[in-house]
Design a protein with these regions (language model features):
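Conserved phosphate-binding elements of NTP-dependent enzyme cores
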Residues: 1-928
Length: 928
């Protein structure tokens, strides 16, 4: 390591003596403006270095640099356990977290694309009347002058304004006009002096057209004439309450002008930014208030099996003796409706007819049926029936587009904002690039179009072309959220910063990883230091500098085992190097299992699936692969998991497919193991989840000193009163409310963070109290309990070590676990139960998340162990090492979004490697 005197802080960041968590007082030199990968086995200390040390110190220094007034709102940030960091720049962390749980947040709002779209439509959008399709314009003084200029020379014009009058008080009106200096009126096309009308005692009749004459002139190219003309037109608009007219006195032709924004008898709203905002009451749909969804009748609940026709009882609510009368009535009265056609094959118009009917309240449509139920809510059976079919549904007014109807009348080159936010991003970009605009509009929109297109290009580069602008943020996966954040950062073009990313390749097919690397290099090339915590081999190869933390996890890690480029890493003696060079490898299984029984999915159509049939082998390791957005999760989660849950009687919502068949004897349970947190309580931890803590509490309650004090197992729990600290209620920390500032968390002064009362801590087992046990890592605890022959506890904790989580502390809060760690804790809990459980189908969503090659080896061993116990395992995965170990691969594709949703391949990894159509083939061939 270079001495501190040699460090050039313009070119390097120097981390001195980092000792947070398991980091062993390490010094790290990081080159600036480079792409740096921090790698190492799970739990070796990568995140402690990248996020908890470098990023945390960058944040702290930024906050310290603010005024004391600004700092009071931000709370004090703790200094990380590091002596010093020299050359540190402002730091930005982009982590694997879903951006927002706010139902109003969308891909468009979080990337700012929608903000620019709103501006674009407000600035250059043209409003068209829904009646005639003509453009709505309002006239200005200049428009009237331009019309006069465009006419032939010396044409005599009469400028008039319509007169609003009351027949009874017409004389008073004439008097007021005379006092204002006006002298003439035009009555039914004929000129008359105001004084003449007064002297005749003229009384108008109903329906007469009377205009006030403002001016008479012929056009002259003269400055003073133009000034007079402008004043006259201004006055005409004022007197006519926004209307005026020019009459050619030679030909009698009249041209009407209005400075109101109206056409076809409709007064339109003038577009502005708020008009297109669904977060503003002015622009939001009045029915759903901008959410896009309402609590209403759920189509999926009313028609659970879309493969049936109306005649075959597709409508679940029209079954039974009484309600089936509605079905019979509909069949009798429906004109030209295909009653034998499956629901999913009906056109939009035919579905509308079934739901809305012919518009009459007597027609037996579905909407009228539910209206009848609502009108009879005093009957309990109708209330129950109605609740059965209610759910969150698309808003019937805006159809999920969130905006008021009038916004759809504003268009740019024939496109309204609704149609653009519905398009997949890979279709929206070419549409934006091909807009035909006038030179004037081009000048206005130039910057806006640049911001929109660059952001869209970045989103496409990180493999998100299948998303739409309108997609809500809380429906995205962690990987998608992170890549959206990444694209947003690139769009902001911030330079001179340190970007720290947490495994951006998660959820990406190897093909998309190549594009991601390009994006990371772009971020580096504009003048940033990009630090990536990553296990992906391709990202490592592309890095300028690699830092390997190890050698193992937990207390066996935390050391800097290598720092240098990829070429030098190959010669190093580290686990990463050994796997990269093939000195250690994940071996291909000697033989693949041949399945005898299958799950048969027929006619899967949800989202982008193209009516596909899929056969999935049981009692095997099956991998579902395909590029990001091809339809893997839809097939596995929305169709397979939901249907099996329905058939097993444990809930689930029916998707759009014909049928799912499986042998009941081989699937008694189904478990979807995704990356959602395992517990929301801050007291939830891995040992409570695995039920090992029950045995540990039992053990302590049996100690001699515990019996003397009358302690039961509950005294060693931090979830109930008894032995836990009364001040912090077993949390170990106390949250202090700071009113207008962020709450501060302080260590509890009573128990000093141990969570228990002092007298409970006096109970010891082999010199360790309950707090000491909770602070042990899984590896340390296993050694400790093995020595003491506590086999029951060892049996429950061993699976945590098997899935590569030996570095976790027993009492570590579940809220601090990453998505990948939470998923592996769930896997460990099934390995504990696996021996006794009935045959189960396990569906894993990317279990390799956050795993080093060495940990993947352990994961595969655990998955194979489940299959050996007679269970079935399906894995949605992109990691080539897991794919090559599968008994069967089903590749969905060929592309993402509407270009995907087909079965490209099904068979063994060897056969896939030879397949020409699959994007996966090339990457698996390299591994076999």
């Amino acid at each position: 390591m270079a001495s501190t005197t040699e460090i050039d802080i313009k070119k390097q960041v120097f981390v001195k003596n980092a000792h947070l968590n398991n980091l062993k007082h390490i010094d790290v030199l990081i080159p600036k403006n480079k792409l740096i990968v921090i790698t190492g086995v799970s739990g070796s200390g990568k995140s402690s270095l990248a996020f908890d040390t470098i990023y945390a110190e960058g944040q702290r220094r930024y906050v310290e640099s603010l005024s004391s007034y600004a700092r009071q709102f931000l709370g004090k940030l703790e200094k990380p356990k590091v002596d010093d960091i020299k050359g540190l720049a402002p730091s930005i962390a982009i982590q694997q977290k879903v951006i927002s749980s706010n139902p109003r947040s969308t891909v468009g709002t979080s990337t700012e694309i929608y903000d620019y779209m709103k501006l674009l439509f407000a600035r250059i959008g043209k409003t068209f009347s829904p009646v005639s399709g003509e453009e709505v314009k309002k006239d200005s003084v200049t428009d009237v002058i331009d019309y006069i200029k465009s006419s032939e020379n010396n044409v005599p014009f009469l400028l008039t304004a319509p007169l609003n009058f009351d027949i009874e008080s017409f004389t008073d009106t004439l008097n007021v006009l005379k006092l204002a200096g006006f002298t003439r009126l035009e009555v039914n096309g004929n000129l008359a002096g105001i004084e003449d009308l007064e002297s005749f005692g003229f009384t108008p009749e109903k329906g007469m057209e009377i205009n006030l004459v403002i001016d008479r002139f012929s056009y002259e190219e003269d400055e003073s004439f133009l000034q007079r003309l402008a004043d006259s037109i201004q006055m005409a608009f004022y007197e006519g309450h926004g209307y005026c007219a020019l009459k050619n006195t030679e030909t009698g032709t009249v041209k009407n002008f209005s400075n109101k924004f109206e056409l076809d008898g409709i007064e339109f709203l003038e577009p502005n930014v708020h008009f297109f905002s669904f977060n503003n009451p002015f622009g939001a749909c009045p029915t759903c208030e901008g959410y896009g969804k309402v609590i209403g009748i759920d189509e999926d609940l009313v028609i659970p099996n879309k493969a049936l026709s109306v005649f075959e009882d597709a409508v679940a609510s029209w079954k039974g003796e009484t309600m089936s009368e509605w079905k019979k009535d509909f069949i009798k009265k429906a004109k030209d409706f295909p009653i034998h056609k499956p629901y999913h094959q009906l056109t939009k118009e035919q579905k509308n007819y079934l739901w809305k009917g012919d518009g009459k309240s007597t027609f037996p449509s579905l909407n009228n049926f539910f209206k009848m139920l609502e009108e009879n809510l005093y009957k309990i059976q109708y209330r129950v029936m109605l609740s059965r079919y209610r759910g969150k549904t698309l808003c019937p007014t805006c159809e999920g587009l969130r905006l008021r109807e009038e916004t759809s009348w504003v268009k740019i080159d024939g496109n309204n904002i609704q149609s653009t936010i519905e398009l997949p991003l890979d279709e929206l970009l070419p549409l934006i690039q091909a807009l035909k605009l006038s030179e004037h509009d081009k000048e206005i929109a130039k910057r806006l179009l640049y911001e929109i297109t660059t952001r869209l290009e970045f989103l496409l580069k990180v493999g998100l072309g299948y998303l739409t602008i309108n997609r809500t943020s809380n429906t995205l996966s962690g990987g998608e959220s992170q890549r959206i954040n990444l694209a947003t950062s690139l769009g902001s073009s911030l330079v001179g910063s340190i970007y720290i990313l947490d495994e951006p390749s998660i959820g990406l097919h190897s093909r998309d990883t190549e594009n991601l690397i390009e994006v990371l290099k772009n971020l580096r090339d504009i003048g940033n230091t990009v630090i990536v915590v990553e296990h992906d081999e391709d990202v490592m190869k592309a890095a300028d500098y690699i830092i390997d933390i190890g050698p193992e996890a937990g207390y066996l890690g935390g050391e800097l085992v290598f720092a240098g480029d990829y070429a030098a890493l190959k010669d190093a003696d580290t686990l990463t190097s050994k796997y990269l060079t093939g000195r250690l490898e994940i071996k291909v299984p000697e033989k693949r299992r041949k399945a005898k029984e299958f799950i048969h999915i027929k006619g899967a159509r949800s989202n982008n699936l193209k009516n596909i049939d899929v056969d999935i082998p049981l009692e095997s390791l099956v991998v579902i692969s395909g590029v990001s957005g091809s339809g893997k999760s839809t097939l596995m989660k929305e169709i397979l998991t939901n249907d099996i849950q329905i058939q097993l009687g444990i809930g689930g919502k029916k998707g759009d497919y014909d049928s799912v068949e499986f042998p009941k004897k081989l699937i008694k349970h189904i478990e979807l193991i995704d990356q959602n947190p395992i517990g929301k309580s801050s007291r939830s931890n891995p040992v409570t989840y695995l039920k090992a803590y029950d045995d540990i509490r039992d053990l302590f309650s049996k100690q001699k000193s515990a019996k003397m004090m009358g302690y039961k197992p509950k005294h060693f729990s931090f979830n109930v009163d008894g032995g836990r600290c009364d001040d912090c209620k077993g949390e170990g920390i106390i949250s202090v409310s700071m009113q207008f500032m962020a709450d501060i968390e302080l260590e509890c002064e009573t128990c000093k963070g141990t969570r228990f009362k002092n007298e409970v801590l006096e109970v010891k087992f082999d010199e360790k109290n309950i707090s000491d046990i909770l602070h042990m890592t899984v590896d340390e605890a296993l050694d400790f309990f093995r020595e003491n022959k506590e086999d029951k506890i060892v049996t429950k904790l061993t699976p945590l070590q098997d899935v590569g989580l030996g570095y976790l502390q027993l009492g570590q809060s579940s809220s601090t676990l990453s998505g990948g760690e939470a998923q592996r804790v769930k896997l460990a809990s099934f390995l504990v139960k696996g021996v006794t459980t009935d045959k189960t189908l396990f569906v894993f969503d990317e279990p390799s998340t956050g795993l080093h090659f060495h940990d993947i080896q352990k994961l595969l061993k655990s998955l194979q162990a489940l299959i050996d116990l007679g269970h079935s395992v399906i894995v949605i995965e992109h990691q080539p090492d897991i794919m090559k170990c599968a008994d069967h691969i089903i590749d969905i594709g060929p592309e993402a979004g509407k270009y995907g949703g087909e079965v490209v391949f099904a068979g063994t990894p060897e056969a896939l490697a030879k397949n020409k159509k699959s994007h996966t083939a090339k990457y698996i061939a390299e591994k076999l």
